[in-house]
Curated annotation (Swiss-Prot):
Protein name: ABC transporter G family member 7
UniProt source species: Dictyostelium discoideum
Binding site for ATP: G274, P275, S276, G277, S278, G279, K280, S281
ABC transmembrane type-2 domain boundaries: 562-810
Localization (cell): Membrane
UniProt entry keywords in alphabetical sequence: ATP-binding, Coiled coil, Membrane, Nucleotide-binding, Transmembrane, Transmembrane helix, Transport
Origin superkingdom: Eukaryota
SUPFAM superfamilies: P-loop containing nucleoside triphosphate hydrolases
GO CC list: ATP-binding cassette (ABC) transporter complex; membrane
Organism lineage: Eukaryota, Amoebozoa, Evosea, Eumycetozoa, Dictyostelia
Residue stretches of biased makeup (Low complexity): 194-210
Protein's membrane topology: Multi-pass membrane protein
Residue ranges of coiled coil: 164-199
Stated family: Belongs to the ABC transporter superfamily. ABCG family.
PROSITE patterns (alphabetical): ABC_TRANSPORTER_1, ABC_TRANSPORTER_2
Length: 815
């Protein structure tokens, strides 16, 4: 509770057990008790839990502006425990604020003052958490400690946001198609008119002779003479085209938002209502400075100042979907965000931040639990529920202790109980820490609706209301929309929006609000000044980001048993099958083709193994896009950490295959030959991994990646020089083998195996007296090891750069 400017020198006790006690806030005289003389304005205190029932003021004075007796927050809202103070829910701090406008003990309980409201839905008690199994406690956020000097001391204070005349236009992607459709429609209409005129003229000639009425004359007494506007009919039947047309003209840009204005006071919890497609998410993206496409106009002020580059440091955004790494625990997920977003803190202080955030979101008992979900490959990891995952997403945003928190549909996909728990977490942030919360929401239950201090309503890209008395406002409109008894106000608002969008007063309502919003809202903002500045936090180095991401990648790899068991056991099985199939080989004439064949198939199989990881790459990219949109790290450290992890895995797979084949099949056994063969197999495996990563990031879809990847791989295998020797390839497309990295790998392992290698030669016939003759048969007699290894490394660099370009430039989160 924040008590402002009370100078009651004769008050020895303020008894907070105000059950069935009336408080007169208009006149505090020199009495020991606060007497309420307001008739019929009873404050039911059944739902106000105060840990300190008696506030003993030994000095008989309450110092001006220095009392912060905050009523603890009750996490269980009882529908029957309502505090009806007939006040508008304008209290941005969710506190019980008593404003003494003069020093003569006269308190003015003016309902228009934002500091004099008791919001019965925003006062809850943190001590009663058993009913909902929530562990939300009164925070003692470690940022307030003196030893954490890297963060601003006022960073836990909410901010005021004013947005004026926000408009947003985006490219009409169907512009060309709509132009073609319009031309076809006009052409068809002209043909129908010409056919109709021809048939009518011939009928007129015949009817004039017989004295019959023409069809136009016979219908004139039934149909109106006004022409039918076909374009209006088409637009009404195609909503998407309606938004991209102006007076029947197709526009290249679609107007999504038009002159949207409003104000959000500090520490308010604001609900953004409206039907689907009304522009709620677009407005949130613009306010959070996350829009990367389209044209934005208008003005956004934070604490009276225009937003700058440091604005994102003080605001956080929670997306509608919980995109989290399934194998990480709750505390590991939050620690990951703390490591990358709070580089100035020591590791001990980061853990303090993580522990406090876990308490704030009520997941203390689940801190060691994994996020859970379906892993790439189909393995299911048991973990958190949907509501708990949503709270973890909120916790990731709270790591930086933001002043402004945006949420897109935080209750989407949750049952009513989990949705209420999530919204209570947000409400506690506004009441206890003063965070300003703005969230879009769709059809909340009544208990959630009453948590909001302010309601904003969007309809067809325009703001039709922003305030705290929405029901009275709707009843004052021309059609007088009255909320029936026993009706969820949120459902009533959405139903009313549908009626307003179809009524004749829609434009009038929108224009009236756009004209008068300054008088209605800006007057409130002048009550208290804001002088808080926005300062940027430090960012961590790319090397540090790489270290943190690499650590997470290896944990994810070893916790995903399906991934590492499948890939490592797959390499073992391939090596074992090859060895069993070809058996023990000798340097005889009969085994020469077997040796070249086993080398070919080894390269071919290692080239195809990375196809098993397509879903893994796409899953990791989804997490990357979500975290990149939040500016947690740069693209390069993520890409390098991913390639490092893959290089380690391919190292193990190639080593297992090479050892098994060399040991069982008895290939040319000397260290240089084995090392070169193994190194080439490893490079081919890594190269294939890189071009699959590049293709998956270019296409963004598993089926397209598989189609393009297999096409490239089959082309590589055909022109590798084994199935068809290079000398026998047609000249028209024989040059393709020079663009084939697998050809260079195959040529190199053949040289390592047969260069100066003595072969057994029978007396009657000897096709290959030694290994050099084998190389000559494959047109590899002049091939050098350095040439093959160098060209393969160049191809690896090419696919590495292509993959990085694709992941950093393509398939970004477009908002």
């Amino acid at each position: 509770m924040e008590v402002i400017s009370i100078n009651n020198t004769n008050c020895n006790n303020i008894n907070n057990n105000i059950d069935n006690t009336n408080i007169d806030t208009n006149s505090i005289h020199n009495k020991n008790n606060i007497d309420n003389n307001i008739d019929n304005n009873n404050i039911d205190n059944n739902s106000i839990g105060n840990n300190n029932n008696n506030i003993d003021n030994n000095n008989n004075n309450i110092a001006n502006n220095n009392i912060n007796n905050i009523n603890n927050i009750d996490n269980n809202i009882d529908n029957n425990n309502n505090i009806d103070n007939n006040n508008n829910k304008n209290n941005s701090n969710n506190y019980n604020n008593i404003d003494n406008n003069n020093n003569n003990n006269n308190n003015n309980n003016n309902n228009n003052n934002n500091n004099n409201n008791i919001d019965n839905y925003n006062l809850v008690n943190n001590n009663n958490n058993n009913n909902n199994n929530s562990e939300i406690s009164t925070p003692n956020f470690p940022y307030n400690n003196n030893n954490l000097t890297n963060l601003n001391s006022d960073n836990n204070i909410g901010v005021q946001v004013i947005f004026e005349n926000i408009s947003y236009k985006t490219e009409n992607r169907n512009y060309k198609k709509q132009i073609k459709d319009e031309k076809k429609r006009k052409k068809k209409l002209e043909m129908e008119r010409s056919n109709s005129s021809n048939s009518n003229s011939s009928y007129d000639v015949e009817s004039s002779a017989s004295g019959l009425q023409t069809p136009q004359q016979s219908r004139s007494s039934i149909l109106p003479t006004n022409s039918l506007n076909i374009s209006k009919i088409d637009q009404s039947m195609n909503p998407q085209q309606t938004r991209s047309t102006t007076n029947g003209k197709i526009e290249k840009e679609i107007t999504i938002l038009s002159n949207v204005s409003g104000i959000i006071e500090k520490s308010e919890m604001v609900g953004l209502f409206g039907p689907s497609g009304s522009g709620k998410s677009t407005l949130l993206d613009i306010l959070a400075n996350r829009k990367s496409t389209g044209t934005i106009s208008g003005k956004i002020l934070v604490n009276g100042k225009e937003i700058g580059d440091a604005y994102k440091k003080y605001c956080s955004y929670v997306t509608q979907d919980e995109i989290l790494l399934q194998t990480s625990t709750v505390e590991e997920t939050l620690k990951f965000h703390a490591d990358l977003r709070l580089p100035g803190l020591s590791d001990q202080d980061k853990w303090k931040v993580v522990e406090q955030v876990i308490k704030d979101i009520g997941l203390t008992k689940k801190s060691k639990s994994k996020i859970g979900g379906i892993l790439p490959g189909g393995m299911i990891v048991k973990g958190l529920s949907g509501g708990e995952k949503k709270r973890v997403s909120i916790g990731c945003a709270l790591v930086t202790n933001p002043s402004l928190l945006f949420l897109d549909e935080p209750t989407s996909g949750l049952d009513s109980l989990n949705a209420l728990k999530v919204m209570k977490v947000l409400m506690n942030l506004t009441v206890i820490k003063g965070v300003t919360v703005i969230c879009s929401i769709h059809q909340p239950r009544p208990e959630i609706y009453h948590l909001f201090n302010k309601i904003m309503i969007m309809l067809k890209g325009r703001m039709i209301y922003c305030g705290n008395d929405v029901l009275n406002y709707l009843s004052s409109l021309p059609n007088q929309y009255q909320c029936p008894n026993y009706t969820n106000p949120a459902d009533f608002i959405l139903d009313t929006c549908h009626e307003i969008s179809e009524c004749d007063h829609y434009e009038e309502i929108c224009e009236s609000w756009e004209t008068n919003w300054r008088d209605n809202m800006l007057a409130v903002s002048r009550i208290q000044p804001f002088n808080r500045s926005i300062e940027p936090n430090k960012s961590c180095s790319l090397l540090y980001q790489y270290k943190i991401l690499l650590n997470r990648n290896f944990k994810d790899f070893f916790r995903n048993s399906t991934q590492y068991i499948t890939r490592l056991s797959g390499g073992f099985m391939i090596g074992l099958l090859f060895s069993a199939c070809f058996g023990t080989l000798s340097p005889s004439q009969e085994d020469v083709l077997k040796i070249s064949g086993i080398l070919f198939f080894l390269i071919a199989v290692l080239n195809l193994i990375p196809f098993t990881c397509i879903t893994l790459f796409l899953s990791n990219r989804e997490v990357f896009n979500s975290e990149r949109a939040s500016k947690i790290y740069h693209s390069l450290p993520f890409y390098l950490s991913t390639i490092t992890t893959e290089a380690f895995i391919q190292f193990l797979v190639s080593l297992i295959v090479s050892l098994l084949v060399y040991t069982i099949n008895h290939l040319r056994w000397n260290f240089s030959s084995f090392f070169i063969t193994y190194f080439i197999l490893y490079l081919i495996n890594l190269l294939s991994d890189l071009y699959i990563i590049a293709i998956s990031n270019i296409t963004g879809k598993s089926d397209l990646t598989f189609i393009y990847g297999t096409t490239i791989s089959i082309t590589f295998l055909l022109f590798m020089g084994h199935l068809v020797p290079v000398k026998q390839l047609p000249k028209s497309f024989g040059w393709i083998h020079w663009l084939n990295p697998l050809y260079y790998g195959y040529a190199t392992v053949m040289v390592a195996q047969f260069k100066d290698y003595p072969l057994e030669c029978p007396n009657d016939f000897c096709q290959f007296p030694n290994g050099n003759d084998v190389l000559k048969f494959y047109n590899l007699e002049d091939w050098t090891l350095q040439k093959g290894i160098g060209i393969i490394i160049l191809w690896i660099c090419f696919f590495f750069v292509s993959g990085y370009w694709a992941i950093s430039k393509l398939n970004k989160e477009k908002r």
